[in-house]
């Protein structure tokens, strides 16, 4: 993997657990937290795809709020303004997966350029990584806002290529979202899919270059490659 000089990470679901909002959802609607979180995430993604197709962009914070409104209406829950604000705020304070902080530090020590490439707005990306104390670990926090379209549009992946100043073949794209990894693979990024939950990959004509179960396993890919290079 010595040809890899930079890594672009998806944020939501890859580095940070989107379902860490379950607790807040349970506080607002006891016993309904998991149900709310699952549908909220589903609709959030659907709204980004639909808005891209319709060329009707709103930023991710708005799409997230719209998805929450739908979720509560669908589940017959009364979402007042205060609860809506509290739950949307929870998306700015997501918890990183447990192995993420140490893994990012190890990748950084290897001299790799690190970027986040996210559907999130600049403010929401910064809020999430700063709340977790991880802001200094990244060279770039890249939002879709400049191109006003969501992943998996090629214009989004181009943002990472431009910001990192590397050819796409030298940028490893890491995502836990199979649809995102598929889009990145079609764009030309070497791609690593973090399959935390034992899912099957999308049937869309592409497969990831690597499939792992955690970010720590991404570090191990580089360690293994370095060990082989030393022996070779």
Curated annotation (Swiss-Prot):
InterPro entries: 2-HAD, HAD-like_sf, HAD-SF_hydro_IA, HAD_sf, PGP-like_dom2, S-2-haloacid_dehalogenase. Catalyzes the hydrolytic dehalogenation of small (S)-2-haloalkanoic acids to yield the corresponding (R)-2-hydroxyalkanoic acids. Active with 2-halogenated carboxylic acids and converts only the S-isomer (or L-isomer) of 2-chloropropionic acid with inversion of configuration to produce R-lactate (or D-isomer). It holds the Pfam family Hydrolase. Its EC number is 3.8.1.2. Changing residue 41 to K: Severe reduction in catalytic activity. 4-fold decrease in substrate affinity. GO terms for molecular function: (S)-2-haloacid dehalogenase activity. Belongs to the HAD-like hydrolase superfamily. S-2-haloalkanoic acid dehalogenase family. Keywords: Hydrolase. SUPFAM superfamilies: HAD-like. PANTHER family: HALOACID DEHALOGENASE, TYPE II (AFU_ORTHOLOGUE AFUA_2G07750)-RELATED (PTHR43316:SF3), HYDROLASE, HALOACID DELAHOGENASE-RELATED (PTHR43316). NCBIfam families: HAD-SF-IA-v2, HAD_type_II. Changing residue 157 to C/S/H/W: Severe reduction in catalytic activity. Homodimer. An (S)-2-haloacid binds at residues 11-12, 41, 118-119. The active site is at residue 10. It catalyses: an (S)-2-haloacid + H2O = a (2R)-2-hydroxycarboxylate + a halide anion + H(+); (S)-2-chloropropanoate + H2O = (R)-lactate + chloride + H(+). Changing residue 177 to W/K/H/Q: Severe reduction in catalytic activity. This is (S)-2-haloacid dehalogenase. The record marks 14, 151, 157 as: Important for catalytic activity. (S)-2-haloacid dehalogenases may be used for the biodegradation of halogenated substances and their derivatives which are widely used as pesticides, herbicides and other industrial products. Changing residue 177 to D/I: Loss of catalytic activity. Changing residue 175 to T: Moderate reduction in catalytic activity.
